[in-house]
Amino acid sequence: NVVVVDGDMRRPKLAQYLGAVGSVGFSNVLSGGATLDDAIQATRFPRLSVLTSGAVPPNPSELLASQAAKKVLSDLKARFDYVIVDSSPLLAVTDAAIIAASSDGVLVMTRFGSTKREQLAHAIKSLEDVGAPVLGSVFTMTPARGASSYSYNYGYYGEGEAGKPEVSTTSPVSGRRRADRRKQEVSGSE
């Protein structure tokens, strides 16, 4: 069983994406306006529940940093096999780092053609600064290459020269590998 929590209390979207009622959710539970049982909703997908963001509060960071938030997340971990929290953008506000600090792991979502290497490095450093374990990064919005080709990327995060963050990846594959593009530093030098 999996529960997805909309931790983006500034621009919540999960209710819309999953066809759920968004008026009562995480913010309401944290502020004492609803119980967790009242706020968790089933979705059309088997074994997937959602805790929508709820009413947009005036103080999202305070709510997310509260003991109530830690208790709710702990209660969810006891009820579900997996708890996935979708948060606000990491570099825009502190909300994501607050949630990440008490998580078992973080996947950093990066948008192809939009997220700069420096931004990714800064985001990872922000997570490390709060002690959040970075499990990896997911590259979204990658362009389609056509029906006759395929591509994939994989990589790992580590330390490069002089302690600089480094991301190692393979290049998109379309028939053959390009070994000369395997390693690229997050700092932008190639």
Q: What is each PLM-predicted segment?
A:
Residues 1-190:
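P-loop NTP-binding module
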